Swiss-Prot record:
It catalyses: N(6)-[(R)-lipoyl]-L-lysyl-[protein] + 3-methyl-2-oxobutanoate + H(+) = N(6)-[(R)-S(8)-2-methylpropanoyldihydrolipoyl]-L-lysyl-[protein] + CO2. InterPro entries: THDP-binding (IPR029061), Transketo_C/PFOR_II (IPR009014), Transketolase-like_Pyr-bd (IPR005475), Transketolase_C (IPR033248). Keywords: Oxidoreductase, Thiamine pyrophosphate. This is 2-oxoisovalerate dehydrogenase subunit beta. The branched-chain alpha-keto dehydrogenase complex catalyzes the overall conversion of alpha-keto acids to acyl-CoA and CO(2). It contains multiple copies of three enzymatic components: branched-chain alpha-keto acid decarboxylase (E1), lipoamide acyltransferase (E2) and lipoamide dehydrogenase (E3). It comes from Bacillus subtilis (strain 168). The gene is bfmBAB. Its cofactor is thiamine diphosphate.
Amino acid sequence: MSVMSYIDAINLAMKEEMERDSRVFVLGEDVGRKGGVFKATAGLYEQFGEERVMDTPLAESAIAGVGIGAAMYGMRPIAEMQFADFIMPAVNQIISEAAKIRYRSNNDWSCPIVVRAPYGGGVHGALYHSQSVEAIFANQPGLKIVMPSTPYDAKGLLKAAVRDEDPVLFFEHKRAYRLIKGEVPADDYVLPIGKADVKREGDDITVITYGLCVHFALQAAERLEKDGISAHVVDLRTVYPLDKEAIIEAASKTGKVLLVTEDTKEGSIMSEVAAIISEHCLFDLDAPIKRLAGPDIPAMPYAPTMEKYFMVNPDKVEAAMRELAEF
């Protein structure tokens, strides 16, 4: 077991899956010789060649469409959108085609495509390089949406996504790429899509979150532990479909629940999590469900001070946790 960065774990997962299965190939903008703008595909072109690591035009609808067609033909495409913000031209392909192929063909066709995309702010990317788009797709049966927080989870879940028989959107927080490091087993392992993970056991309050915010919650929990407040931290890992059993269990355990997302609040993944808790845990709650999210404004600002105001961070999570604990 070695320690590696979040992005290296993603790169390794693709490499191992391409070695394991000749049907797996990568396509996207600058994924070839350049290795991707974040170097997520570095070294793949040199090892597998241009037939399996394909540079594409700047046309996200084409990237998705070609990948969907290849998946229906029996291949295992990993289609990279350079930034999650740019996935919008491909929405019709993903929602109208990939998500519905199995249903409308009465199981005659499947679409085992993985669409990877870096999301999130904190890197001064402003309007078109900082968005969180997961909620746009999170009411489309037929899709799965995975958003890992650690290198270990990233590798295991990406492998699972490649082997899945249906389309998977795999969103990676770009700020986590080199910031987050962790132990990753050398052996071949997969993690189940659709299952949350308890990252920290606690008894006083529950924090449910995903992606980079998991690390903020863990940092805040360590601070609160010194004051005798025990936080239970749950990482959703898959944001669609949600692990309802894990959500209900975590909410019922403490009776005080904080939901954290970098996305804007209204209509977010956490809105659905709150609905699940309200429907199933109402009489187990000792406080109103609390949400911490980005402000409901059109886009992430560019100015560093304004970006900081928008972003969730450990201090904001800690303050929200303290307020909830004191209720």
